[in-house]
Amino acid sequence: MKTKLYFLTPLLLFALSACNSDDPSSSETDVPAAKERQDIPLTRSETQLADHTLDFSLALLRQASLQEAGKNMLVSPLGTAALLNLMANGAESHTADELYAVLSPSGVSAGELNDFFSKLNTWLPELDNTTSLAQAYSLWMDDQFTVHSGYTDVAQSVLGADVRQLDFQNTQSQQQLYDWCSEKTEGCIREIDCPLADAQLVMLHTLYFKGAWTDKFDPAQTRTETFRGNLREVAVPMMHDRQRAGYAATESFTAVSLPYGNEAYSMLLVLPAAGTDMAQAGRALADGAWKELTSRLYGAQVDLKLPKFTTEVEQPLNEVIAGLGAPTMFKPGADFSKLADGNMFVSKMFQKAKIEVSEEGTKAAAVTAAIMTMSAYE
């Protein structure tokens, strides 16, 4: 039976091989009527960047699925790309070349890339007044460490980053990072695995999303059923509905698009053919299946069965990003000379993400982090 689902949006990519059955709390209140959707006005270079960001998202899914085969996988491409761009602003030479090759098509400048992420930060929350979407950036420096003012000026003025200085040897400092993450994700993510003792700088990006389905599921139709994943079977609350939705099918995948609010945002549910594992599906989606599915979507009456669940995943990213073509920043000898003096490199990059899917809609959050350390490399 085909029961493995892939949830794909521009903000989050989620592969569900076996889901948690925690019942997400529902404290929904009345929401205003959805305003008419408006698309984001993009320049020619920004349109190129939007297309490239989609390609990056699918490549990230492919690379992460290789690393996390057989496990629940939840990753935010937007959060990952946004933090990589923040790092790229401090990089030089080969380190910068690799980062910009991953993030943007040739011919797009660093300034245009910054403007693109700044525009997303401004416009994405405005697309739907019934949907909440918020991003935030921050830089956390040890009080014995100095960052070049030119770098912090860009981080603050263009990307709106908070800049904080702390005593990283003080055990209370870590709690301040936790509190910031919790505040920016509306309490969804309260802690991250971010040791400070050997760090000089921590970069953070947060993403928070909360959207109500355009057509909600009836809670009276939710009942416990068996969900068959890659490795095990679990009993989950299964939501049921028959509604008009975007639908597409190929020999390899079936897809349904479920919109939120005024339909500016939607969740694409992708069901691979029987016998397809996560790595195979991730590779196929990145190699053209995703674009084929979305181009084939048409309105149809669909009988839906969707698990109601909450799950949280912390995803290491060092090997994933290196596999995408930017390995140098993780090695002593990386060049972050636009950021600070000394031999800085990224000792750990990771993302913690959480998603709740219920009859009302979806709540999701991601914290993407990079811990930067001084090396003795000469």
Question: Each predicted region: which residue ranges?
Answer:
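Ser/Thr-centric signal marking residues that sit
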Residues: 3, 95, 368
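Sec-dependent bacterial lipoprotein signal peptides
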Residues: 1-17
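Detector for small/aliphatic-rich hydrophobic stretches
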Residues: 6-7, 19-168
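Short Gly/aromatic-enriched secondary-structure transition segments
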Residues: 99-103, 217-226, 279-288
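Soluble, non-membrane globular domain cores that form compact, hydrophobic packing
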Residues: 20-22, 145, 258, 277, ...
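Extracytoplasmic/secreted cell-surface and envelope-processing proteins
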Residues: 93-99, 276-279, 313-315, 365
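Disordered, low-complexity tails and leader-like regions
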Residues: 12-15, 24-27, 355
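Non-catalytic, conformational "gating/processing" segments within enzyme and secreted inhibitor domains
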Residues: 70, 110-273, 295-376
